[in-house]
Amino acid sequence: MPEQQRLASLDSSTASRLPAYSQTLFEAKTEKGLTFEAIAQHLGRSEVAVAGLFYGQVQASAEDVDKLSELLSVPKEAIAKQMMGFPDRGRAGPMPPVEPLIYRLYEIVQNYGYAFKAVMNEKFGDGIMSAICFNTTVDKEVDETGASWVVITLKGKWLPFARF
């Protein structure tokens, strides 16, 4: 029997920290029964970028707003101004995170951050991985035992530190 599709929705404890349009988008997404993957296909963007739009962490283009308005049956005027403004990133949750899945990602950086840094430095030199010239994907793999595995790919441009 196929697994029933479940949709990500906006938790009331998070809503107050997000832009006003977030609730509008999440309600319309739920009403239409759409996944971030389906919305991403319509917008021609990655599903993580689209989820970022919903949480106010990614700036929308005029084309994004038009397509979201059409797909979700949300009046363009209700979302355009805020979505096309400059995002106020990094305010969606407390630090350190308390949501268990988000905390596990934080824990990965705590535990392996210096290891990632050391390996990147050896491969690329002194610098940083951009989170601006960046993309990411989330995929699902199922192993031979039937266990599900999460595959998160982080791809950022390497930015060497300038000598001055």
Swiss-Prot record:
Keyword Protein biosynthesis: no
Catalyses which reaction(s): cyanate + hydrogencarbonate + 3 H(+) = NH4(+) + 2 CO2
SUPFAM superfamilies, A to Z: Cyanase C-terminal domain, lambda repressor-like DNA-binding domains
UniProt entry keywords in alphabetical sequence: Lyase
Active site: R104, E107, S130
SMART domains given in the database record: Cyanate_lyase
Gene Ontology process terms (BP): cyanate metabolic process
Molecular functions (GO terms): cyanate hydratase activity; DNA binding
Superkingdom assignment: Eukaryota
Enzyme class: lyase
Gene3D superfamilies listed in its UniProt record: Cyanate lyase, C-terminal domain, lambda repressor-like DNA-binding domains
EC number, UniProt record: 4.2.1.104
Family, per entry: Belongs to the cyanase family.
HAMAP family tied to this protein: Cyanate_hydrat
Main function: Catalyzes the reaction of cyanate with bicarbonate to produce ammonia and carbon dioxide.
Protein name per UniProt: Cyanate hydratase
Underlying gene: cyn1
